[in-house]
């Protein structure tokens, strides 16, 4: 199977967790878009759901395909969020934000009872950091914030290029009006320490480390679907099922 077909298979497996009447957080990115297309088929045949999109891009696709939408203001508590990821580690800590919607994705995930991550096998890693970490920052004081991020990372033994995300020759601007810095720190051994340190920088709006939010990962590979469940309590093992 090619990469797109793997995304479709992961999305199809996630759709099995959706039931009539659910309030759904709907992610952003190419894998999440495959889920939207499959969800739209279910809606067309009578399934009733309400979707809360994590980006204007996702909202536009949902409207085009007829998936009913709400907002977090109208629907502040969600049953399930389905979203993709740029990297997934064995504890279901994620790097997200490659699609530029990490702030809204994190807010929606936190408002959900459960979060299912869908991805192909290439996104599974032992330690996060191969994919550059997206950091959403205020436009004001950009250079000062970039320097503060580099110094904070250095205090944790991390270093590497920090680049402003560009699109069409201009700085990429998020739906919230912010810039994104992509930090190529390499291997991140202590994600929680980095998360806390980045949150302490005034110019940082949010970062792409998702810690303790994903409850299940559905991973598609050439040998089938692997379902990984997050540990339910400290010290317990993450559970793996292969279908």
From Swiss-Prot:
Organism of derivation: Mesorhizobium japonicum (strain LMG 29417 / CECT 9101 / MAFF 303099)
Coiled coil (UniProt feature): none
Superkingdom of origin organism: Bacteria
Residues reported to bind substrate: 28-31, 83-86, 96-99, 123
Protein name: Ribose-5-phosphate isomerase A
InterPro entries: NagB/RpiA_transferase-like, Ribose-5P_isomerase, Ribose5P_isomerase_typA_subgr, Ribose5P_isomerase_type_A
Residues making up the signal peptide according to the UniProt record: none
Group of enzyme by EC: isomerase
Catalytic activity annotation: aldehydo-D-ribose 5-phosphate = D-ribulose 5-phosphate
Family stated for the protein in its record: Belongs to the ribose 5-phosphate isomerase family.
Keywords: Isomerase
GO terms classed as biological process: pentose-phosphate shunt, non-oxidative branch
Entry's EC annotation: 5.3.1.6
Upper lineage: Bacteria, Pseudomonadati, Pseudomonadota, Alphaproteobacteria, Hyphomicrobiales
HAMAP family xrefs: Rib_5P_isom_A
Pfam families referenced in this protein's UniProt entry, alphabetically: Rib_5-P_isom_A (PF06026)
Quaternary structure and partners: Homodimer.
Physiological role: Catalyzes the reversible conversion of ribose-5-phosphate to ribulose 5-phosphate.
GO molecular function, one term: ribose-5-phosphate isomerase activity
Active-site residues (renumbered): 105
SUPFAM superfamilies, A to Z: D-ribose-5-phosphate isomerase (RpiA), lid domain, NagB/RpiA/CoA transferase-like
């Amino acid at each position: 199977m090619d990469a797109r077909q793997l995304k479709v298979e992961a999305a199809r497996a996630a759709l099995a967790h959706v039931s009539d009447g659910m309030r759904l957080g709907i992610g952003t990115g190419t894998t999440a878009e495959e889920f939207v297309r499959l969800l739209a088929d279910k809606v067309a045949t009578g399934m009733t759901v309400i979707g809360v999109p994590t980006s204007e891009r996702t909202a536009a696709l949902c409207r085009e395909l007829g998936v009913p939408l709400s907002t977090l203001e109208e629907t502040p508590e969600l049953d399930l969020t389905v979203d993709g990821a740029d990297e997934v580690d064995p504890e279901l800590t994620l790097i997200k934000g490659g699609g530029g919607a990490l702030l809204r994705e994190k807010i929606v995930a936190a408002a959900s009872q459960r979060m299912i991550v869908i991805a192909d096998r290439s996104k599974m890693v032992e330690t996060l950091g191969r994919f550059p970490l997206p950091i959403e920052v205020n436009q004001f004081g950009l250079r000062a914030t970039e320097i503060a991020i580099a110094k904070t990372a250095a205090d944790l033994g991390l270093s590497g290029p920090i680049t402003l995300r560009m699109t069409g020759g201009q700085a990429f601007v998020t739906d919230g009006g912010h810039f994104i810095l992509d930090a190529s720190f390499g291997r991140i051994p202590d994600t929680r320490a980095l998360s806390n340190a980045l949150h302490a920088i005034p110019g940082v709006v949010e970062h792409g480390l998702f810690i303790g939010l994903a409850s299940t990962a559905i991973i598609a590979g050439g040998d089938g679907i692997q379902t990984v469940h997050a540990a339910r309590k400290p010290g317990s093992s993450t559970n793996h099922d292969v279908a």
